[in-house]
Curated annotation (Swiss-Prot):
ATP 1 binds at G202, P203, P204, G205, S206, G207, K208, T209. Residues 169-442, 858-1110 form the ABC transporter domain. The chain crosses the membrane at residues 538-558, 571-591, 626-646, 658-678, 682-702, 768-788, 1202-1222, 1242-1262, 1290-1310, 1317-1337, 1347-1367, 1378-1398, 1425-1445. The keyword Thylakoid does not apply. It is found in: Membrane. One of its GO terms (cellular component) is membrane. The gene is ABCG44. Gene3D superfamilies: P-loop containing nucleotide triphosphate hydrolases. May be a general defense protein. GO terms for molecular function: ABC-type transporter activity; ATP binding; ATP hydrolysis activity. Keywords: ATP-binding, Membrane, Nucleotide-binding, Repeat, Transmembrane, Transmembrane helix, Transport. This is ABC transporter G family member 44.
Length: 1456
């Protein structure tokens, strides 16, 4: 619930006794907290009078004006006094004023937050107001889903096709549904009380997220739900649940270009102030009646958070402070390709985005992922204070809560396999499990115990009834036992008495759909869109530059000194120029597709959270782009109009400008609508290409109006480009330049030209065209709004379930025996991660690590790392050129020693690891790094090291087993045979417990496939199968629950025990995980080390060191040493103690020991040799090629949004073309017949090619991110990767071009001659191939998919212009004729037309010229040149493929 409810909810208007008399200046006898500023006798009389006068002036204002005014103390007044301040409008507080106000109210969040909230509560209580509260009940709640199980669930080409047909048959009730019902939650019930913090625990897959979504009213409609959820006795249909409660997702979806402050401010503005304003007015009224004068600072704060419509509300600054985000408030959020804040900070932004709003109930899903334990503790503590003091209702799901964080909660809900095992007070949970025979060991966190005690694999170690043999207690038995436990009985009794609705506070539940007025939401979205346009200005500048270049080319290509107004042929050339101008703006609008699609995930999240209606998003997107459209069209029209030699009439110039402006706007609106319809980049690209194709073919230029078949004439009349083409042609050809009468007729040349292409000849068609285009602009924007308003986000978080996993789940619930030999080996393992594990267990787990390796040590001395100073910091007055992130760090990592690299968020842990592992791509590195005494060489180091990145990056369309097989194939030495390799993979899978997931698809994070913890285990396994000597792990337990973290740490410990060097950054370890480490490398914020040394038994060495520092508080018995260590070494503690822990460390014996150790390791051992490998990579070039092709083949087969959609796109386009150009290929008696046939070829080549090029780009962009990780790991060189990416396309394009070619060739009616047929297939195949490879090349040459799509659209336009259809090669000026030979599309058209018609001698009926002569003279096409054309077309495919390979090899756009 709202932190700023730090103020309140609406009052219950209940008075608690008489107020003090109006004449009294003295507060009544409330002494608990000094909430109110009372004139002190020690103050000077003048100050007292001045203060009194200001308050008196405020008191005289009407209530609505008084709540907007407050007295702000001067910046240097640290006492919170308003005496020296001034009266201000609270809605207009500046950044510095807000900052100083918060400093006075909450100087240090850890220490002052609770007293601040108590002051707020005291002020509310004082006048007899109450906070609204919410009690959430859920009764007999069951949730089921339908899913395919096993291999049928994999999204392969075949499965997707079958599933689509099956879904259609299910709708028609032809066949039964073959999906299996999966039970997610089973008959759960409980009560969540206000003012109590509830912790939701449970292993992955237990149903935690589903329960939270159900309680927050955000379940998807595809789930089957029974039972009910009520708020204060009201059903979900009686109020707006999405605004009464806030759900905080575990997935961090944010706009990367916005800063942290901007992200939270936007959210606060959208969610509004709720009922704070109403409460404030009542509060002010009562205080005035009682003559109570509140503390000025508190008064200003409460007023400021109650006034809506502020660009940046002070509540944003408050939330930034309590979440520890104030240090990065003005840094952009960023993403994988755009450097921004850290993963832990991004997770806090996700939390802050919702708690700035006024919701009274909060459901938080895994909000601590990526955070260190002290930060998690502080955040949960702050949330707990808000909950208990201000009457909130809070449920938080945490994966690995430390004991001190666990103790902050009042109630526990423990879920396991969809059953509630326990819900009730935290104090009784251990009592319940002890009654079942299980006891939590000493030095074991209770939360960790609870996560593991219901697991079949972990339960036995906690069995406490030594006099009885252990038996597995299934989940169902726990759930039944809880019903008879006294806590369960109390809960049942409570549920049997319905909530009394009459006691529900009227302001508890929200009935309004949105948090602010519609006008305010529109203003907010306009402000954000302007901000994003400013941040993305490069895109618009680049687009304008492209248009300028194209315009210059058009001007010089259609130069008026070369253009004539003599014949109908001259007119057709001018018509081509007009057509191209129109097409250029259609292509320009194509780039809107990528920009709109990229923003959709964030839009859908905010829409579902009811931040704003879809129209508030679409109107700014449309309206704010109009000035850009005006500028872009001005470039093309005003520069080229007179140079080309269009009719020299100013009126016609501006009419052409208006028409092309409408085309530009229509195109942008159309592609935004298609983006909303497709929702994924691949599908949207395919739909957009299809739409573009249909519109242009039916525009009246490619195919004459008179030749459109009757069954397609409706398409002609609804095509916006038909109206545009007719209007722009009428505007030109009815001008005086074309008024000359054609010899032997009574019609002008202009009208003859229009008639020859089947266009309309009346002037009214210009205004009809303008009206139609304006209508389409409105219609497409309305459709865009409707699509965004009603369609669901694409892709669901899903996991492919195997039969084995289902059986195991059923057995865990019921207690039945599992007969699965594959898992039996691991079923007896425990999660004991301590170093004194049973010898038998250790040797059993280590058996998968027996491949030979060389133990290696890493030493580094005085490592400094800096980056260029961010512009945001320079703007705030920082004058240095570089920002130093690591300040002379030294240390060593040794074989057989497991080192924990720790520190608070922002300490530089990941930065140090990236520097040591050689993963930094930018910045400035200084210092020495040696490997077993020899200077580090990155190429060699990559062969012997592994790096588990914090972001789990994997190819999404392969299974878990295939990911491991691929890694092992490429990274294990070539002398390891296939059988050994497979056995090694199996052993690693067993160690990391991935066997049940072996056939699960990896998927994309947050979209589909593996869960966070499963993905994390896969990341570790991928590195382990490489058998490295040195392993770096960046937060291997982040995002895992306690049990999964224990599995991972057991694996890591076993890896170390084989003699490897392992270093892990770790954020929030439990006691047993922390003490699984041998040594600690502790850093503080700012990039300096403060402890480097052994932990000792039960962390005794670490504790002894820090307790030896004067002033440091002693550790409490049983307290987590990791948490204590982080708490006592904060910067705030340094200020309190007046010391620097860095200096303490540098002056210690430990530092001298480490320096000696570094010197020793930095000298090569006697008789040793530097690392040397005869080849750079483990495998030969040919093996790398085969492995990359193997993975790409699997990826393509399982990527139906790409392969299936593209296949059916080719099929539909073929049928469409066949019906539009039906039998036109057999007609060749007139010039127009040849133009029609060539039009079918031109349209197919250009637009199918564009579709293939556009749709491959997002696929390559996703895989390129994986490629950067795999190349950095030394798996392969760039060329084999490019080989796999290129070669895998060959069979797909072959099948698709063959399907298209056969259908189109037959339906259009080209000549049935084997040679001509195969020439047609040949040219179509290589054309689609070179377009596909060009799409890859565009991604390879640019940093992002967005830029690639804009660059591509530029070249599509150029190729269209020089294709030979818009203007034939002989008609081009001599200075541009050369480029037609460099344009691949012109070669394709040459080949297609010349192979079909170039050998025909029959004369044309309308001119009498033989066909072959006409083709040679008008187009420059010769039949005997076909061999050269064939080689050239294949050559372009080869050129683009080779260029893509070189771009991948030489360019790296990843910034680290």
């Amino acid at each position: 619930m709202d932190t700023g409810e730090a103020a309140f909810g609406v009052a219950s208007l209940r008075l608690r006794g008489s107020m003090a008399s109006a004449s009294s200046r003295r507060a009544p006898s409330y002494r608990d907290y000094d909430v109110f500023s009372i004139a002190s006798s020690s103050r000077a009389e003048a100050e007292d009078d001045e203060e009194a006068l200001k308050w008196a002036a405020l008191e005289k204002l009407p209530t609505h004006a008084r709540v907007r005014k407050g007295i702000v103390a001067a910046a240097d007044d640290g006492q919170g006094s308003g005496a020296a301040g001034e009266v201000v409008d609270v809605a207009g507080l500046g950044f510095q004023e807000r900052k100083h106000l918060l400093e006075r109210l909450v100087r240090v969040a850890e220490e002052d937050h609770e007293s601040f909230l108590l002051k707020l509560k005291q002020r509310i209580d004082r006048v007899g107001l109450d906070f609204p509260t919410i009690e959430v009940r859920y009764e007999h709640l069951s949730i089921d889903a339908l899913a395919h199980v096993g291999s049928r669930g994999l999204p392969t080409f075949l499965n997707t096709t079958l599933n689509s047909l099956e879904s259609l048959a299910n709708l028609l009730h032809v066949v039964p549904n073959k999906k299996r019902p999966l039970n997610i939650l089973h008959d759960v019930h409980g009560v969540i009380k206000p003012r109590r913090m509830t912790l939701l625990l449970g292993p992955p897959g237990s149903g935690k997220t589903t329960l939270l979504l159900a309680l927050a009213g955000k379940l998807g409609s595809d789930l089957k739900v029974s039972g009910k959820v009520t708020y204060n006795g009201y059903g979900m249909d009686e109020f707006v649940a999405q605004r009464s409660a806030a759900y905080i997702s575990q997935h961090d979806l944010h706009i990367p270009e916005m800063t942290v402050r901007e992200t939270l401010a936007f959210s606060a503005r959208c969610q509004g102030v709720g009922t704070r304003y109403d409460m404030l007015t009542e509060l002010a009224r009562r205080e005035k009646a009682a003559n109570i004068k509140p503390d000025p600072d508190l008064d200003v704060y409460m007023k400021a958070i109650s006034v809506g419509g502020q660009e940046t509300n002070i509540i944003t600054d408050y939330v930034l402070k309590i979440l520890g985000l104030d240090i990065c408030a003005d840094t952009i959020v960023g993403n994988e390709m755009l450097r921004g804040i850290s993963g832990g900070q991004r997770k806090r932004v996700t939390t802050g985005e919702m708690i700035v709003g006024p919701a009274r109930a909060m459901f938080m899903d895994e909000i601590s992922t990526g955070l260190d334990s002290s930060t998690t503790f502080q955040i949960v503590k702050s949330l707990g204070q808000i909950t208990s003091i201000l009457g909130g209702t809070t449920v938080i799901s945490l994966l690995q809560p430390a004991p001190e964080t666990y103790n902050l909660f009042d109630d526990i809900i423990l879920l396991s396999d969809g059953h509630i095992v326990y819900q009730g007070p935290r104090e009784h949970v251990l009592e319940f499990f002890e009654s079942m025979g299980f006891k939590c060991p000493d030095r074991k966190g209770v939360a960790d115990f609870l996560q593991e005690v219901t697991s079949r694999k972990d339960q036995q170690q906690y069995w406490a009834r030594t006099h009885q043999p252990y038996r597995y207690i299934p989940v169902q038995e726990f759930a039944c036992a809880f019903q008879s436990f006294h806590v369960g009985q109390t809960l049942s009794d409570e549920l049997s008495h319905p909530f009394d609705k009459s006691t529900s506070h009227p302001a508890s539940l929200t009935t309004s759909t949105y948090g602010a007025s519609k006008l305010e939401l529109l203003r907010t979205c306009i402000a954000r869109e302007l901000l994003l346009m400013k941040r993305n200005m490069f895109v618009y500048r680049f687009r304008a530059f492209q248009l300028l270049v194209i315009t210059i080319i058009v001007m010089t290509l259609f130069l008026r000194t070369n253009m004539h107004h003599e014949t109908r042929t001259d007119g057709i050339v001018y018509l081509g120029a007009l057509f191209f101008a129109m097409v250029a703006h259609m292509f320009n609008g194509f780039s809107e597709l990528a920009m709109a699609t990229i923003k959709l995930p964030v839009f859908f999240k905010q829409r579902d959270y009811l931040f704003f209606p879809s129209w508030a998003y679409t109107i700014p997107t449309w309206i704010l782009k109009i000035p850009i459209s005006c500028f872009e069209v001005a470039i093309t029209v005003f520069l080229s109009y007179y140079v080309i030699g269009f009719d020299p009439n100013v009126g016609r110039l501006f009419k052409q400008y208006l028409l092309l402006l409408l085309v530009n706007q229509m195109a942008a609106a159309l592609f935004r609508f298609i983006a909303a319809l497709g929702r994924t980049m691949v599908v949207a690209n395919t739909l957009a290409s299809f739409a573009l194709l249909v519109l242009l073919v039916l525009s009246g230029f490619i195919l004459s109006h008179h030749d459109v078949k009757k069954w397609w004439i409706w398409g002609y009349w609804i095509s916006p480009l038909q109206y545009a083409m007719n209007a722009i042609a009428v505007n030109e050809f009815l001008g005086h330049k074309w008024n000359r009468l054609v010899q032997g007729t009574n019609t002008t040349l202009g009208i003859e030209v229009l008639k020859s292409r089947g266009m309309f000849t009346e002037a009214k068609w210009y205004w009809i065209g303008v009206g139609a285009l304006f209508g389409y602009v409105i219609v497409f924007n309305i459709l865009f709004t409707i699509a965004l308003g009603y369609l669901k986000p694409s892709g669901k978080a899903q996991q492919i379930l195997s039969e084995e996993a289902l059986k195991e789940k059923h057995a865990n619930i019921t207690g039945e025996t599992i007969n699965d030999p594959r898992n039996s080996a691991s079923s007896g393992q425990t999660t004991n991660t301590r170093r004194n594990a049973a010898p038998g267990e250790a040797s059993e787990n280590r058996r998968g690590m027996v491949l030979p390796f060389a133990p290696l040590a890493v030493a580094f001395n005085n490592i400094r790392y800096s980056v260029d100073m961010p512009p945001e910091m320079k703007a705030q007055g920082v004058d240095q050129d570089r920002l130093l992130l690591l300040k002379g760090v030294s240390g060593s990592f040794r074989p057989g020693v497991l080192t924990a690299l720790m520190g608070v968020s922002g300490a530089g842990k990941t930065t140090l690891m990236d520097v040591l592992a050689g993963r930094k791509t930018g910045g400035y590195i200084e210092g020495d790094i040696s490997i077993s005494g020899y200077p580090k060489k990155q190429e060699t180091f990559a062969r012997v090291s592994g790096y588990c990145e914090q972001n789990d990056i994997h190819s999404p369309n392969v299974t878990v087993y295939e990911s491991l097989a691929y890694s092992a194939w490429l990274r294990l030495p070539s002398d390891v045979d296939s059988e050994t390799r497979k056995m090694f993979i199996e052993q690693v899978m067993e160690l990391v417990e991935l066997n049940p997931l072996r056939d699960a698809l990896v998927g994309l994070p947050g979209v589909n496939g593996l869960s966070t913890e499963q993905r994390k285990r896969l990341t570790i396994a991928v590195e382990l199968v490489a058998n490295p000597s040195i392993i770096f792990m960046d937060e291997p337990t982040s995002g895992l629950d306690a049990r999964a973290a224990a599995i991972v740490m057991r694996t890591v410990r076993n890896t170390v025990d084989t003699g490897r060097t392992v270093v892990c950054t770790i954020h929030q370890p439990s006691i047993d995980i922390f003490e699984a480490f041998d040594e600690l490398f502790l850093m503080k914020r700012g990039g300096e080390e403060i402890y480097v040394g052994p932990l000792g038994h039960h962390s005794c060495d670490l504790i002894e060191y820090f307790e030896g520092v004067e002033g440091v508080s002693k550790i409490k018995p049983g307290y987590n040493p990791a948490t204590w260590m982080l708490e006592v070494t904060t910067l705030a503690q340094e200020d309190v103690l007046g010391i620097s822990f860095t200096d303490v460390y540098k002056n210690s014996d430990l530092y001298q020991r480490n320096q000696s150790l570094i010197k020793g390791i930095s000298r090569p051992p006697q008789g040793s040799k530097d690392l040397f490998f005869p080849t750079q990579f483990s495998q030969s070039f040919s093996t790398q090629c085969m492995a990359c092709l193997w993975k790409q083949n699997l990826s393509y087969w399982r990527n139906p949004p790409y392969t299936v959609v593209r296949f059916f796109f080719s099929l539909i386009v073929a049928l469409m073309f066949g019906t539009i150009f039906w039998r036109l290929g057999s007609k060749r008696s007139r010039q127009q017949d040849l133009f029609n046939a060539m039009g079918s070829m031109y349209a197919a080549v250009l637009f199918m090619g564009i579709s293939y090029s556009s749709s491959v780009q997002p696929v390559v962009a996703v895989e390129r991110t994986v490629f950067y990780r795999e190349r950095a790991a030394g798996m392969y060189s760039a060329l084999p990767y490019a080989f796999g990416q290129v070669v895998v396309e060959l069979p797909y394009v072959l099948v698709q071009s063959a399907v298209y070619g056969v259908i189109v060739y037959a339906m259009i009616g080209f000549e049935w001659e084997a040679k001509k047929f195969f020439w047609y297939l040949y040219f179509m195949y290589f054309t689609l191939l070179y377009f596909t490879f060009y799409g890859m090349l565009a991604v390879g040459l640019t940093p992002s998919y967005n830029i690639a799509s804009i660059v591509s659209s530029f070249f599509y336009g150029i190729w269209n212009l020089f294709s030979g259809f818009v203007i034939p090669r002989p008609s081009m000026p001599v200075w541009w004729r050369w480029y037609s030979w460099a344009c691949p599309v012109s070669w394709t058209l040459y080949g297609l037309v010349a192979s079909q018609f170039g050998d025909l001698k029959e004369p044309l009926r309308d001119t009498g010229v033989p066909i072959d002569v006409f083709l040679r003279e008008y187009f420059g096409f010769k039949h005997d040149f076909l061999g050269v054309v064939a080689v050239a077309v294949a050559g372009f495919a080869t050129l683009f493929a080779v260029s893509f390979s070189l771009s991948i090899k030489m360019l790296n756009f990843q910034r680290r």
